[in-house]
UniProtKB/Swiss-Prot annotation:
It comes from the Eukaryota. It is found in: Lipid droplet; Cell membrane; Cytoplasm; Mitochondrion membrane. The record marks 174 as: 4-hydroxy-2-nonenal adduction. It is a lipid-anchor. A NAD(P)H-dependent oxidoreductase that acts as a key inhibitor of ferroptosis. At the plasma membrane, catalyzes reduction of coenzyme Q/ubiquinone-10 to ubiquinol-10, a lipophilic radical-trapping antioxidant that prevents lipid oxidative damage and consequently ferroptosis. Acts in parallel to GPX4 to suppress phospholipid peroxidation and ferroptosis. This anti-ferroptotic function is independent of cellular glutathione levels. This is Ferroptosis suppressor protein 1. The keyword Mitochondrion applies. The modification by 4-hydroxy-2-nonenal (HNE) adduction in mitochondria results in loss of the oxidoreductase activity and activation of a novel function in mitochondrial oxidative stress signaling.
């Protein structure tokens, strides 16, 4: 797939909705193959959100996590919010009235969640970076911090704070007994707990925050009283919420209402085509594939979608996507981590080398063919 594809220039035009990990992987491959495409995103920069939590605690790190789309994709990038997909006329409609025609559509809308783990809003690169620098200030000014949610984002957030500021009091509150993602090996989840305890994180497990809606989030206060359903009360200066990830279905919900899974993801076949549409693909978090929602998987999906657009043009057999054994690395601060590769446990040294030190930031700059700041 390294060489350019010869074809009738007017026959194929791909629109990619969403410039996350799957979207930029697909766009980069189409660009290399000289296949006409447009990438649409409401931000002007790709957000390497794998490193969002470190950008919340380490001043100066955020600028490494936002990478301009237009520098890489030039006139093939449009900043805008998708408001409708017109299946009959094969166009993507933007909020500003632009209509983008497509022969093939790749939906890569990702998922949405609370800041700082996610940054999903219409924004410039400068504003986005400043939002994270402001968050660093809130963390620096707080002595006692509560992290709500003990999935992968919550445990990584707690670890990042204690790594950067070991003197701060950090309490992690999680509604279940086991930490991190349910798909992980029990020994990996246990090691996550051990790492947090070694770092001095206070754990409140099998407890749910009962007054969450009344709490100020991401804002330093003199005293915030966090209450749980077990009657525990924690005094904090800062509350950071790391749960509630949802599929970003707003762009396509009205067009594909009958093709949606219960969580809002699009039902796809083994070729990652949306059920009933051979020219429309869903990749990444918005594809209903039985595997954890991860940047790594989104990039694998992009490979399949682009290969199948090329294969369909050349009347070749389509490539199938089969989820493999789980590879999942948890960076617990820059010097620690744990995870599994192809279903096998890997410890601190391997995870530190593979992910924890720079959180794969350099990989995204390479994908975007730019040099990091």
């Amino acid at each position: 797939m390294g060489s350019q594809v010869s074809m009738d220039a007017g026959a194929v035009h791909v629109v990619i909705v969403g410039g996350g990990f799957g979207g930029i992987a697909a766009a980069s491959q189409l660009q290399a193959l000289n296949i006409p495409f447009v990438l649409v995103d409401m931000k002007d920069s790709f957000h390497h959100n794998v490193a969002a939590l470190r950008a919340s605690v380490e001043s100066g790190f955020a600028k490494k996590t936002f990478i301009s789309y237009s520098v890489t994709f030039k006139e093939n990038f449009r900043q805008g919010l998708v408001v409708e997909i017109d299946l009959k006329n094969q166009t993507v409609l933007l909020e500003d009235g632009q209509a983008l025609p497509f022969s093939h559509l790749i939906l890569a809308t990702g998922s949405t969640g609370l800041f700082p783990g996610k940054f999903n809003q219409v924004s410039s690169q400068q504003m986005a970076i400043q939002a994270y620098e402001d968050m660093v200030t809130q963390v620096q000014r707080s002595q006692s911090i509560v992290v709500v949610g003990g999935g992968s984002a919550g445990v990584e957030m707690a670890a990042e704070i204690k790594t950067e500021y070991p003197e701060k009091e950090v309490t992690l509150i999680h509604s279940k007994m086991a930490l991190a993602d349910t798909e992980l090996l029990p020994c990996v989840r246990q090691e996550v707990k051990e790492i947090l305890l070694r770092k001095g994180v206070q754990l409140l497990l099998s407890e749910r925050v009962s007054n969450l809606e009344a709490l100020p989030v991401n804002e330093r206060r003199e005293c915030i009283k966090v209450q749980t359903d077990k009657g525990t009360e924690v005094d904090a200066n800062l509350v950071i919420v790391c749960n509630g990830i949802k599929i970003n279905s707003a762009a396509y919900r009205s067009a594909f209402g009958d093709r949606l899974a219960s969580n809002g993801a699009l039902r796809v076949n083994e070729y990652l085509q949306v059920e009933g549409y051979s020219h429309i693909y869903a990749i990444g978090d918005c594809a209903d594939v039985r595997e954890p929602k991860m940047a790594y998987h989104a990039s694998l999906h992009a490979n399949v979608a682009v290969a199948n657009i090329v294969n369909s043009m050349k009347q070749r057999p389509l490539k199938t996507y089969k989820p493999g054994s789980l590879t999942f690395l948890l960076a617990m601060g820059r010097n620690d981590g744990v995870g599994q590769i192809s279903g096998f446990y890997v410890g601190r040294l391997m995870v530190r080398l593979a992910k924890s030190r720079d959180l794969l930031v350099s990989t995204s700059w390479k994908t975007m063919k730019q040099s990091p700041p």
